[in-house]
């Protein structure tokens, strides 16, 4: 039996001393705002929104990164509806996945907005993402900062996404293992 469940991406690590984020959901769906490439997010919303949701925008500050989402028992019907929506649109979705920005993340956000699901936005410490652009990953011996795990001082849940090719070949797997 459960009260709430966390859905987390495979490229994400939760620090063992992380506070209990379930205590911060207020009994609602909860996630962390996407804190990365806003051009990518806006383009993705426009692409998927226009084709599947009869809208090409919504407030980017409500766009949740799919790598950290908390649901509870009250969301069973909502999730069933999301799955039904996906199954109904899967052929068209599979044609655009890989061609457009994003995959399921944007569709989940657009569907959530369409359904007007009440949510709690959690602080970025629970899905610290886009670490490269925040200068929290060491990629080059000439960087002015030291080769340490700087991200440990900046959050509790580390999402190793959007890591560009780099001279030291340090990809998500490198950082997860380290």
Question: Positions of the model-derived regions?
Answer:
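Residue-level detector of short, conserved catalytic/binding motifs and their immediate flanks
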Residues: 3, 67, 156
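Short, basic and Ser/Thr-rich N-terminal targeting/leader segments
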Residues: 8, 64-65
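A short secondary-structure junction signal
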Residues: 16-19, 42-45, 79-84, 170
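Small-molecule pocket liners
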Residues: 28-29, 66-69
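Short, flexible, basic/aromatic active-site loop/helix in glycosyltransferases
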Residues: 47-60
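A glycosyltransferase accessory/donor-loop signature
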Residues: 59-60, 64, 73-178
